[in-house]
């Protein structure tokens, strides 16, 4: 008989309380056990004589006491938007950085970026603040300002050496994300973009739980045209629906390569099943646009420079602005006010 996986925990239970750690029991749960994570754990009549009684009775119960503090801290943030992808390497962090810079081209807007890709933080590099550190005051942590109206928070600012690996399990990641939300002086922001790691992991569950009371506006999902990427994006969309996260739209990244010399468009990654636009129609979600592959965008990220300042007329720049305008429309804002024409 081959190896088998344990019966997975119902997804509804995980989403309802992903941060509560199940107590380490010393004996199997008896027949009439109320459940080691229930409010009656260790105190119900059926717990009498159980070897696990003391363990269950001392385990933390009830809602997270820090949630009201998070809600209060983020009271001045108007729109909280997650950026998700089912697969790594599709340009999710790149898109997050470009969305932030596009929104920040409006001098009337104040934008924040929270990097929750704990094990692979790349946002500081892309926004040109990799060498900065966090300043702590009596009222909390100060974010790093990449521009007068663009604030950034990432674990990268806390590393002694920029090449240090972060080898953490879920609880420690959850704790840092909570600190980013509860202890950082975000102040008044028009937009807070949350860059996440690929897939559906502890970081996603934590952010969703911590922001539940202060309301997430929704999520932007990033893909590339090929089916191997779309396959994982379908799972990401399913996660959002089960978690109650509104999908603001799908962005197809690296859709075409437009030659900067002759402007001829070449399909590098073939959309064998119709690409992002077809998937959006299939899943019933908005399609925000397709961003062409432009090596100059990668170069701008490497140097931490604004792609919008360096190549304002490039097809990728124009496409990114259209994505942001489409996103603005989804959250009830005037697209032309969010990213002015020209």
From Swiss-Prot:
Binds 4 [4Fe-4S] clusters per heterotetramer. Contains two stable clusters in the N-termini of NBP35 and two labile, bridging clusters between subunits of the NBP35-CFD1 heterotetramer. GO terms for biological process: iron-sulfur cluster assembly. ATP binds at residues 86-93. GO terms for cellular component: cytosol. Its cofactor is [4Fe-4S] cluster. It is found in: Cytoplasm. One of its GO terms (molecular function) is ATP binding. Keywords: 4Fe-4S, ATP-binding, Cytoplasm, Iron, Iron-sulfur, Metal-binding, Nucleotide-binding. Residues 1-45 are annotated as: Disordered. It comes from the Eukaryota. [4Fe-4S] cluster 1 binds at residues 33, 47, 50, 56. Pfam families: ParA. [4Fe-4S] cluster 2 binds at residues 259, 262. Component of the cytosolic iron-sulfur (Fe/S) protein assembly (CIA) machinery. Required for maturation of extramitochondrial Fe-S proteins. The NBP35-CFD1 heterotetramer forms a Fe-S scaffold complex, mediating the de novo assembly of an Fe-S cluster and its transfer to target apoproteins. Belongs to the Mrp/NBP35 ATP-binding proteins family. NUBP1/NBP35 subfamily. Heterotetramer of 2 NBP35 and 2 CFD1 chains. This is Cytosolic Fe-S cluster assembly factor NBP35. It comes from Chaetomium globosum (strain ATCC 6205 / CBS 148.51 / DSM 1962 / NBRC 6347 / NRRL 1970). The lineage of its organism: Eukaryota, Fungi, Dikarya, Ascomycota, Pezizomycotina.
